[in-house]
Amino acid sequence: MTMTSLVNLSLLMLLLFPSPPASGQQTGNTAEKVRGVPPANRYYIEISISGTSLSLYEKAADGGRVPLRTYPVGTAVRGLDVYPTGPGKVTGIYFDPWWYPTPYSRKIFRERGIDLPGAVPPGHPLNYMGKFKITLSHKTRKGAIYRIHGANYSWRVGKRVTGGCFAMHNDQGLELARTIPVGTEVNILP
């Protein structure tokens, strides 16, 4: 695809699809304290890259953790050494997000004969964010934002197939996104 064609495609997409909101559709749970635990400190997430799972816990007043749910997630392909591990937190929660493919993602798609635009709108079959996006404070070695997001293709969930992010079934991810507030602790294990 030529540069002129790409520019024309981008302009066409801007006409056909509304531009994303400047701040995204972020949520923040402002509910009052529950059982003496502030909302941002109420939940704890642990993600296992090798175990392809995400576990949600509720923190108890005594400092313990009560397991609530474990979800399968798609994680980074074996040998891909760009993902961060360790503690962090949720920095944003978005519904029906746009996808801004990284240069690496665009390269992979180009190798498959698909020229991705710089921004892929919600609902588009090539939007790999699915129905939700949860941004994390974790960053890759190159400074890219790390995310938990939906998967429009369910075969990606529960396997080591992503370019680094965590892919969940859309319905399960929406459940998670509606449960946790921004500020929730997240620990990523290898």
Identify the function of each model-found stretch.
Residues 22-24:
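Boundary at the C-terminal end of the N-terminal hydrophobic targeting segment
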Residues 1-9:
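Bacterial N-terminal signal peptides that target proteins for export
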Residues 8-18:
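Bacterial N-terminal signal peptides
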Residues 155-164:
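Short, basic/aromatic beta-hairpin or loop at an interaction surface
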Residues 140-141, 153-155, 171-173:
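Short Gly/Pro-enriched loop/turn and capping motifs at secondary-structure junctions
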Residues 166, 171-190:
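N-terminal targeting pre-sequences for secretion and organelle import
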Residues 149:
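Histidine-centered active-site/metal-ligand motif
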